[in-house]
């Protein structure tokens, strides 16, 4: 392992309003950007690009996607003009083989799961980035293995950033007033934290089998916000430190847990 190996991050992105707000979560992301080694490029996996098959942004100047509605105009006026990297996109095609990866040269860009956190980490938007989609047709263990395939990039000064929420149930969210976590949400969030460093066969991994937890299906009625975590755990070497820079549950059922591997 390189002494300058880049960390791998899972960031609980939460509401798009975090882009405009100053709170414990946004300050934690900013602190990571200030204290972690500066990468030469970033590969980001966001819950908001959930596709059939795997794609990677491959344009020179990806657009900022405002994939949300009903928020203040200031949010739609905010852009994150980080450069793309067609060369890095091609590198992912080769690295992830035999998994077929489509080079997306115009359709996607950076959605709020990616730019919404990176605008706090690297507000200058001057680090080349590509975004990798999450294949909705694959089981959890497959995504863990994808993280393993990406791990070698960390020795090339490339940071892996995954963005989601390990508890994400908007149907039960308390949008106004009471903010106390639901017991099942707190239980599942604790279950995730307790199993971050689990080692053993993939098919037995508690976080691959997250729906077996009594609060798993309530915490994640759909998979897209949970799966990004598995990419980061797949990139762990089994020895390096795993730390939690910030944690919390907002609106009763939205976990803001963030995880850093290797810093």
Label every model-predicted segment:
Residues 75-83, 105, 133-140, 216:
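Flexible, glycine/proline-enriched loop segments at strand-loop-helix junctions
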Residues 46-48, 108, 158, 163-166:
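Short, well-ordered beta-to-alpha junction loops that form the rim of enzyme active sites
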Residues 2-103:
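A short aromatic-anchored loop/beta-hairpin motif
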Residues 9-10, 67-72, 122-130, 207-208:
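Short, basic/glycine-rich phosphate-binding loops at helix/coil junctions
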Residues 2, 35-36, 121-125, 152:
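Solvent-exposed alpha-helices and their adjacent loops that cap or buttress functional pockets
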Residues 9, 41-43, 128-130, 159-161:
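Conserved beta-strand elements of the Class I
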Residues 94, 98, 127-128, 136-138, ...:
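Surface-exposed, charge/polar-rich loops and edge strands
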Residues 89-144, 149:
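Internal, conserved structured core segments that host functional sites
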């Amino acid at each position: 392992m390189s002494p300058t190996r880049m960390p791998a991050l899972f960031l609980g992105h939460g509401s798009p309003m975090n882009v405009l707000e100053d709170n414990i979560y946004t300050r934690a992301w900013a602190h990571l950007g200030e204290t972690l080694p500066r990468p030469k490029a970033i590969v980001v996996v966001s819950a908001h690009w959930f596709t059939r098959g795997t794609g990677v942004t491959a344009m020179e100047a990806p657009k900022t996607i405002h994939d949300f509605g009903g928020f203040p105009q200031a949010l739609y006026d905010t852009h994150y003009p980080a450069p793309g990297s067609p060369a890095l996109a091609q590198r992912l095609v080769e690295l992830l083989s035999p998994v077929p990866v489509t080079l997306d040269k115009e359709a996607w860009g950076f959605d709020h799961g990616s730019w919404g956190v990176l605008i706090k980490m690297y507000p200058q938007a001057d680090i080349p980035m590509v975004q990798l989609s999450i294949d909705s047709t694959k089981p959890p263990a497959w995504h863990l293995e994808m993280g393993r395939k990406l791990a070698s990039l960390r020795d090339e000064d490339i940071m892996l950033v995954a963005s989601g929420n390990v508890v994400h149930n908007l149907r039960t969210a308390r949008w106004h007033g009471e903010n106390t976590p639901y017991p099942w949400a707190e239980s599942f969030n604790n279950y995730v934290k307790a199993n971050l460093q689990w080692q053993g066969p993939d098919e037995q991994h508690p976080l691959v089998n997250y729906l077996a937890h009594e609060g798993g299906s309530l915490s994640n009625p759909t998979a897209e916000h949970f799966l990004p975590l598995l990419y980061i755990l797949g990139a762990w070497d089994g020895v390096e430190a795993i730390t939690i820079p910030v944690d919390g549950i907002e609106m009763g059922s939205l976990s803001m847990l963030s995880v850093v591997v290797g810093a």
